[in-house]
Amino acid sequence: QYLALQKYLGLDNLFCIPAGFERLPAIDRYFDLVFCMGILYHRKSPVEMLAGIQQMIRPGGMLVLDNLVLESSHGMCLFPESRYAKMRNVFFIPDLKCMESWLLRAGFSSVSCVDVTKTTKEEQRKTDWIQTESLADFLDPADPDRTVEGYPAPVRAVFTACA
């Protein structure tokens, strides 16, 4: 994702840190903008990670967060028993209100959900570069609105929030 952005934007002040969040040094109030894309649901402590990200962003800076969500607003979260869409490393899938609460609790303000999109088989499919299983293999063949484990099919949301 970073290389695609850099190719088209060509900015010399845009960079990617290819490291796990816990391996980053303490960076206090440094970044103007942080993208957290498809990572949070893999974390065992998502609110702690959000609080850590919030500490890295300058006052007035922004977080852009892409995450799996449930399409409801009850303030609840799915904790898959063992797997979600055949992935063992998915721990928490919040609904929209729950994600907003997590962001506020982590110290962010002006939280906004700017997009909610169901993941499609066209978007995540086998290609010449990736021949492994794809979304079609992760969904219930009898009910494509469910994963093979019986959970709601993947829906992604993008949130913005100010530090």
Where are these predicted regions, by residue range?
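Conserved catalytic loop of SAM-dependent methyltransferase domains
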Residues: 109-138
